[in-house]
UniProtKB/Swiss-Prot annotation:
Protein's name in the database: Hepcidin-1
Propeptide: 25-64
Keywords: Antibiotic, Antimicrobial, Cleavage on pair of basic residues, Disulfide bond, Hormone, Secreted, Signal
InterPro entries from the UniProt entry: Hepcidin
Example GO BP: intracellular iron ion homeostasis
Organism of origin: Danio rerio (Zebrafish)
S-S pairs: C73-C89, C76-C79, C77-C85, C80-C88
Statement: the UniProt record of this protein carries the keyword Disulfide bond: yes
Localisation: Secreted
Gene name of the record: hamp1
Length: 91
């Protein structure tokens, strides 16, 4: 019984080693594949950025002046020296 367990374990280990050896990729080939994938991604990214630059409206690139303060105007009656109703702006 003990001999059969050892034999079975040896067969399983040998099978795993053979399978891993067959599916293994040499290090040089793996590095070349990674370089090829990186260069393809770089080319795709360059193509996308060029397309984005062409589609960008030039007016969007100009900075616009934002209001430096909030407008505090409101419609009210008998306020801000108004005898009647009107807009009152406080700065």
């Amino acid at each position: 019984m003990k001999l059969s367990n050892v034999f079975l374990a040896a067969v399983v280990i040998l099978t795993c080693v053979c399978v891993f050896q067959i599916t293994a990729v040499p290090f040089i080939q793996q590095v070349q594949d990674e370089h090829h994938v990186e260069s393809e991604e770089l080319q795709e990214n360059q193509h996308l950025t060029e397309a984005e630059h062409r589609q960008t409206d030039p007016l969007v690139l100009f900075r616009t002046k934002r209001q430096s303060h909030l407008s505090l105007c409101r419609f009210c009656c008998k306020c801000c020296r108004n005898k009647g109703c009107g807009y009152c702006c406080k700065f």
